[in-house]
Each structure stands twice: as C-alpha cells, then as structure tokens.
Swiss-Prot record:
The gene is ndhN. It comes from Paulinella chromatophora. It comes from the Eukaryota. It is a peripheral membrane protein. This is NAD(P)H-quinone oxidoreductase subunit N, organellar chromatophore. NDH-1 shuttles electrons from an unknown electron donor, via FMN and iron-sulfur (Fe-S) centers, to quinones in the respiratory and/or the photosynthetic chain. The immediate electron acceptor for the enzyme in this species is believed to be plastoquinone. Couples the redox reaction to proton translocation, and thus conserves the redox energy in a proton gradient.
Length: 158
C-alpha cells in the first residue's frame, strides 16, 4: 500500500525546500504518519489552521499586538458614538515563541492552506530562509494520492 511510506523522501524534500505544499487523500491518515516520522527524527511539531493567520511573519515570529474584538471600540449610547476608545491592545508572544528556544528543528504544519492568498503563501515560503530551523508544511487540499511540491514553485505557477 503506498501510504505505508518511510517519509525519507518527504523529509529530504522538506529540508531542501524549507516549505512544502501537501495534497492529501480526503480520507486522511497519510499526513499524521508523515508528522509522526518527522517527530521521531527530532522535529518539534506545531499543528494549526491557516485561517485567521493574518500577517504570517508577525504572527509566527515577532512580538505583536492582539486586537480583541470588543476592545478599542467606541461606546455608544442611543445609537450615537460617544467617548473615547476603551481598553488597550495587549502585546502577545509569537505563536512559535516557545518552540524557537533550543537547537532542534521546528515543523509548522498548516491545515486549510487553500484559503491563503498568493502573497500570504509567498511570505510563508520565505520564512524558512529567515529562520533556517523552521520547516513549513501547508495542506493545500485533497488529492487522490499523497503528493507534495515546493511551496515556492506552487506560488510561482499561480
């Protein structure tokens, strides 16, 4: 069965390119096997959704502000906005902050990558060039068989 793969070719391509676009069968299972094999060779893995990512570089690697929906809005009475803005915007750690400590390689696995624009995908594909330990896998949708390609090449072809 082709899904019983060792993951060596996938790991080799991931380390060479830094960011891969992954197309997985809709019944699932293959991606978790690949992630488990990468964890076994020392990667610290973080799995999250690409929805609501915003500016990828700031959200993943930099100290940034988090705008809570109910803060920073004007209070209104009887339909008229009155008063000053309420609240302050807290600064939060980058999402990958704790994983960036140490020397082990980091794997960021983004689900639902098909919702990202070409500019967001381009920014994500450039992140491993800035942080060499960071490797990124973006699930780009379903396919009949498991396949992957360089995220940079996918962005260029769009």
């Amino acid at each position: 069965m082709p899904l019983l793969l060792t993951g060596q070719e996938f790991r080799r391509d991931l380390e060479r390119d830094g960011a891969l676009a992954l197309f997985v069968p809709l019944e699932g299972g293959a991606e978790t096997r690949l992630m488990r094999r990468l964890r076994a060779v020392g990667y610290k893995a973080y799995l999250t959704s690409a929805k609501g990512l915003g500016d990828p570089e700031a959200y993943l690697l930099k100290l940034h502000e988090q705008h809570v929906p109910h803060l920073g809005r004007r209070m209104s009475t009887e339909g008229k906005p009155e008063g000053k803005s309420v609240g302050h915007v807290p600064k939060v750690m980058p999402m990958l902050g704790p994983l960036l400590e140490g020397k082990s390689p980091i794997l960021l696995w983004l689900l639902e990558g098909q919702v990202l624009s070409s500019s967001e995908l381009s920014a994500i594909s450039n992140l491993p060039k800035r942080e060499p330990r960071l490797k990124i896998v973006v699930e780009m949708g379903g396919a009949r068989a498991l396949r992957w390609e360089s995220l940079g090449k996918l962005v260029e072809s769009r």
